[in-house]
């Protein structure tokens, strides 16, 4: 069994984002250094997906400031067998509203990819809010991305992107890795990109009822995936998940790495290490 760990390397940004922040948005990356130090030699390889998008350029004048702010750290991790990848949020500045909002097909995507790709080979992605669409996966495939691990099997949810509310839908995708169809991102098809779903945990009966109620309040009566629950690596796990997938994938964020998050994350890593045949891999090594 392959185990894939990813970190969405997000900064601290205000919401809504209407003007350039005065504070250092990347100060939260100090948490990553504390996590790495606490883990020591026991840290398995992780895929660090550094955020590069229009909101980052707006806030720092550069798409690649997340890499440059901790270049020595990222290079050190890469030298230890970790992988660097790309994370982004599909938002563009809406001049009419004077703030960032959701943009399903942003003009800046290729430029952000090129900027971060000047520092390392960009092979892996995770999307902001775990968002997926036919248009997005086709564009990632065209950019040469070989692994995306954003899918949440059975998940239907709603997120705020600036002042816009968007629906996240992975209700029909499989739990095992698949090459998406160019005209249906939730079904196997013709894209070269491999989608590796995040491993779901088992939801409680009460949790399933609450989730169905949430869906109904948002206009969806779908019962798909009610038994699935997403847990981050840094959250308490009551039990290990059970999945037929040959790849178990989990994620976390720098902001999750307070003392409690670091302790839980390392505890969960140790639990995964006890699984028979467990092999921790980076995203590219899934292939």
Residue ranges of each PLM-predicted region?
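Active-site beta->alpha N-cap acidic-glycine motif
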Residues: 1-75, 80, 121, 261, ...
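Surface-exposed cleft-lining segments at the edges of enzyme active sites
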Residues: 18-23, 57-61, 98-99, 120-122, ...
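Well-ordered, non-membrane alpha-helical segments in soluble/globular domains
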Residues: 22-35, 63-71, 105-111, 174-178, ...
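Metal-dependent polysaccharide deacetylase catalytic core of the NodB/CE4 family, i.e.
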Residues: 42-133, 151, 200, 249-252, ...
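Short, surface-exposed basic-aromatic patches at helix termini and helix-loop junctions that form
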Residues: 76, 117, 134-146, 267-274
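Active-site-adjacent pocket scaffolds in enzyme catalytic domains
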Residues: 127-244
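C-terminal domain-boundary segment and adjacent tail
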Residues: 221-287
């Amino acid at each position: 069994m392959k185990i894939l760990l990813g970190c969405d390397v997000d900064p601290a940004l205000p919401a809504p984002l209407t003007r350039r922040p005065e504070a250092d948005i990347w100060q939260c990356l100090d948490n990553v250094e504390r996590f790495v130090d606490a883990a020591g030699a026991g840290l398995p390889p992780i895929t660090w997906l550094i955020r590069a998008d229009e909101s980052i350029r707006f806030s720092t004048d550069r798409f690649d400031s997340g890499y440059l702010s901790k270049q020595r750290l990222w290079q050190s991790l890469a030298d230890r067998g970790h992988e660097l990848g790309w994370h982004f949020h599909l938002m563009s500045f809406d001049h009419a509203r004077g703030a960032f909002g959701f943009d399903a097909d942003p003009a800046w995507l290729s430029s952000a990819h090129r900027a971060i790709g000047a520092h390392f080979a960009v092979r892996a992605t995770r999307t902001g809010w775990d968002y997926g669409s036919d248009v997005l996966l086709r564009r990632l495939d065209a950019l040469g991305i070989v692994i995306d691990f954003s899918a949440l099997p059975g998940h239907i949810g709603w997120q705020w992107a600036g002042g816009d509310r968007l629906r996240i839908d992975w209700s029909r995708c499989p739990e095992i890795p698949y090459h998406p169809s160019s005209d249906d991102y939730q079904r196997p098809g013709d894209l070269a990109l491999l989608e590796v779903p995040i491993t779901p945990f088992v939801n409680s009966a009460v949790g399933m009822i609450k989730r169905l109620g949430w869906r109904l309040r948002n206009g969806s009566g779908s019962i798909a995936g009610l038994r699935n629950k997403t847990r981050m690596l840094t959250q308490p796990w009551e039990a290990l998940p059970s999945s037929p997938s040959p790849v178990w994938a989990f994620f976390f964020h720098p902001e999750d790495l307070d003392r409690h998050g670091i302790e839980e994350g390392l505890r969960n890593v140790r639990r995964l290490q006890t699984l028979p045949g467990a092999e921790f891999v980076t995203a590219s090594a899934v292939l």
